[in-house]
C-alpha cells in the first residue's frame, strides 16, 4: 500500500483491517504455556508497520467484527467500518442426509452417528488444538461410540513453530497412547464440499481460539446448523450468546469442555433450537449476498472528492 496513492491518485482506497496487534487484552501473552519472549514483543510492533502506513493513506477500511475493529488505535477507528467478509449460507446449510466416507478405515458416518468435530486451517495452540487434544482421552472414555473428525494442516498459521516436530506430533506424543485411533480421525485439509459434509454430520463442534481473528470456520459451522462449543473469548462472545445459539466454555478449562461436549452428545434433541438459532444468526448478520456484499459495495462506491484532491497534491510535495 505504500505507493498506491501515488500510482492511483484518483482511486478510492479501502484497506482490509483484519487485526491490529497489541500487548494487552489480545493474543499476546494470553496462553501461559507459550509465554512470549522479548522478540515476540518486537514482533507485535513490526506486524503493525505496514497497516499503520496503509491506514494513513486510505480513504476507508473494513474490519470483519466489532472486536477486531476495536483492536485499532483510536486515531484510525473513525475510518474503519465493521463488515464481515460474508458467509455463503445458500451453499453452507444443514443437510441431515449428508455422509462422510473415510475409505482408509472403511467407515461412513452420518448425522445419526455420534460425531465430534474440530476444524482449523492448521492444528495449533492459537486455535486451542492443545486443549482439545488433552480433553480427548476422557471424552472418548465417556463417549464409547463417538468418532472424532479433526480437520487441519500441520503447519503454523499464527504463533511460534516448535523445533523439529509439529503440534500434532507433539500432542500425539503426549496423549496418543490414550486415544483409540479407530475413532480419532485426522483428515488434513479437505476440499470444501467434504469439509461441509463433516460439519453437516457433526453432533458437537468444538471451536477454541485465543483473543484473535475470528475464524470463518466457526460461522460456517453455525450456518451448517452445528452445535458449536466455543471458547468464551472476546471474538467468540461477539457472535455466540451462551445457550441460545451456541455454548461457551473457558478456553483453558478441559473439564468444562469435556462435560459440555458429553452433555450435547447425551441429549441431542435438547439442542435442536440452538442449531436453528446458530444458522439464523449467520443468515441475519453474516450472509454474503444479502448482508455483507451490499455493505462492502457501498463502502467501495462512496466518493470522497476532497480527500482525493488533497492527496493528489502529495506527489508534488515530494518533488521539492
Located regions from the model:
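Nucleotide-activated donor-binding/catalytic signature segment of Leloir-type glycosyltransferases, i.e.
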Residues: 156, 162-189, 193
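C-terminal alpha-helical cap of glycosyltransferases
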Residues: 288-320
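Acceptor-binding helix/loop patch of EC 2.4 sugar-transfer enzymes
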Residues: 11-49, 90-99, 111, 153-165, ...
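A short, well-ordered alpha-helix in the C-terminal region of glycosyltransferases
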Residues: 256, 263, 270-285, 291, ...
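Short hydrophobic beta-strand element within catalytic cores of glycosyltransferases
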Residues: 227-230, 240
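Conserved acidic donor-binding segment of nucleotide-sugar-dependent glycosyltransferases
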Residues: 242-243, 247-254, 263-268
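Aromatic "clamp/platform" in nucleotide-sugar-dependent glycosyltransferases that forms part
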Residues: 210
Amino acid at each position: 500500500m505504500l505507493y498506491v496513492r501515488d500510482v492511483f491518485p484518483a482511486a478510492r482506497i479501502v484497506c482490509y483491517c483484519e487485526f491490529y496487534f497489541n500487548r494487552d487484552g489480545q493474543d499476546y501473552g494470553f496462553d501461559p504455556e507459550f509465554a512470549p519472549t522479548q522478540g515476540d514483543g518486537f514482533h507485535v510492533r513490526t506486524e503493525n508497520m505496514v497497516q499503520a502506513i496503509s491506514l494513513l493513506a486510505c480513504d476507508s477500511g473494513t474490519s470483519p467484527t466489532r472486536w477486531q475493529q476495536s483492536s485499532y488505535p483510536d486515531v484510525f477507528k473513525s475510518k474503519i467500518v465493521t463488515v464481515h467478509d460474508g458467509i455463503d449460507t445458500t451453499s453452507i446449510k444443514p443437510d441431515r442426509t449428508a455422509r462422510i466416507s473415510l475409505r482408509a478405515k472403511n467407515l461412513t458416518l452420518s448425522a445419526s452417528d455420534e460425531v465430534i468435530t474440530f476444524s482449523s486451517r492448521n492444528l495449533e495452540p492459537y486455535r486451542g488444538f492443545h486443549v482439545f487434544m488433552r480433553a480427548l482421552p476422557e471424552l472418548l472414555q465417556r463417549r464409547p461410540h463417538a468418532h472424532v473428525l479433526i480437520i487441519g494442516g500441520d503447519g503454523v498459521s499464527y504463533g511460534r513453530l516448535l523445533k523439529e516436530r509439529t503440534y500434532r506430533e507433539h500432542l500425539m506424543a503426549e496423549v496418543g497412547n490414550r486415544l483409540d485411533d479407530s475413532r480419532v480421525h485426522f483428515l488434513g485439509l479437505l476440499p470444501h464440499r467434504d469439509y461441509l459434509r463433516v460439519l453437516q454430520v457433526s453432533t458437537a463442534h468444538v471451536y477454541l481460539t485465543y483473543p484473535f481473528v475470528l475464524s470463518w470456520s466457526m460461522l460456517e459451522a453455525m450456518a451448517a446448523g452445528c452445535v458449536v462449543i466455543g471458547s468464551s473469548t472476546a471474538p467468540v462472545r461477539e457472535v455466540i450468546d451462551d445457550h441460545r445459539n451456541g455454548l461457551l466454555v473457558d478456553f483453558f478449562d478441559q473439564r468444562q469442555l469435556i462435560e459440555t461436549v458429553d452433555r450435547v452428545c447425551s441429549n441431542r434433541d435438547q439442542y435442536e433450537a440452538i442449531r436453528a438459532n446458530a444458522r439464523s444468526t449467520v443468515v441475519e448478520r453474516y450472509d454474503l449476498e444479502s448482508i455483507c456484499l451490499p455493505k462492502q459495495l457501498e463502502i467501495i462506491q462512496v466518493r470522497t472528492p476532497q480527500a482525493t484532491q488533497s492527496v493528489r497534491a502529495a506527489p508534488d510535495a515530494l518533488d521539492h
